[in-house]
Amino acid sequence: MSGISAQLVKKLRDLTDAGMMDCKKALVEVAGDLQKAIDFLREKGLSKAAKKADRIAAEGVVALEVAPDFKSAMMVEINSETDFVAKNEGFKELVKKTLETIKTHNIHTTEELLKSPLDNKPFEEYLHSQIAVIGENILVRKIAHLKAPSSHIINGYAHSNARVGVLIAIEYNNEKNAPKVVELARNIAMHAAAMKPQVLDCKDFSLDFVKKETLALIAEIEKDNEEAKRLGKPLKNIPTFGSRIELSDEVLAHQKKAFEDELKEQGKPEKIWDKIVPGKMERFIADNTLIDQRLTLLGQFYVMDDKKTIAQVIADCSKEWDDNLKITEYVRFELGEGIEKKTENFAEEVALQMK
């Protein structure tokens, strides 16, 4: 115990929630190295905080903060094990300090965050101490930190239930439009919170992903058509493609010629083809970009005007405001997304306890 101060023992106890004597022994074993002592207790199964940190954390909050000038914004997903803990004051303070640390040290990843200083110690130590105090595993799972040049606006939306957050960055040219772009970015963020687009644009998809999704989509439509046929309702068109990335110039030219050949066969005069073909092409593109309409932000129909896609809204605003608007970044966090929650089996639990 020589050279091991009471303050160091207390610090280790605060970080691990292990017993006082176990903390003393651990520090002696590793010659007073705090991090090695934490690892020692964890390996021995004596760190209660470490045990808590092994448990699945799928509740918590999504929180964001947008700068007053709308030139930067931060968003985090911080997980706890229960929604009850996510509502207590200690957890709320942790969320606040996390955002402050991200802003102060210009952090973009969870790895950077854990190493960053907070109150003269690494953030990771602070996090471990909060796990011990609060009594649940807490995990900073995702960080988004957007910064933009003067020609961009960044705005966001966090749902009141703190389970969904979105950040949107829009490029613009005309400074007088800045207030309108701020509002537009927030409205589009609200749309994305509700409609769950996976990516900004179809260019973010791989061709393999599109082909697999298209096969699933065709199977879904065929099944719907069976029911529609039974009920005497109109049938949906079966698409050949699923995304705009598949509609090359050659594909579109081939389809245009097919429509023209069809009109010729029907005996329609060539002088009226230009009035008919564009509408048919528009319908063809709509029928063959259903994956974009479901999964891309730009391809989805706007919740505030469901006759226009987000891309059309951006184009219309550009024209109306004499500007050239472009969505350059889109980030959406949904609490616990992708986390496999543990399913408790009460019967198995009782059986194990009886062995």
Swiss-Prot record:
Any GO molecular function: translation elongation factor activity
Keyword terms: Cytoplasm, Elongation factor, Protein biosynthesis
InterPro entries: EF-Ts_dimer_sf, Transl_elong_EFTs/EF1B, Transl_elong_EFTs/EF1B_dimer, Transl_elong_Ts_CS, UBA-like_sf
Localisation: Cytoplasm
One CC-aspect GO term: cytoplasm
UniProt entry tagged with the keyword Chloroplast: no
Positions of the UniProt region annotated as Involved in Mg(2+) ion dislocation from EF-Tu: 82-85
One Pfam family matching this protein: EF_TS
Keyword Cytoplasm found: yes
SUPFAM superfamilies, alphabetized: Elongation factor Ts (EF-Ts), dimerisation domain (SSF54713), UBA-like (SSF46934)
Functional description taken from the UniProt entry: Associates with the EF-Tu.GDP complex and induces the exchange of GDP to GTP. It remains bound to the aminoacyl-tRNA.EF-Tu.GTP complex up to the GTP hydrolysis stage on the ribosome.
Similarity comment: family membership: Belongs to the EF-Ts family.
Protein name: Elongation factor Ts
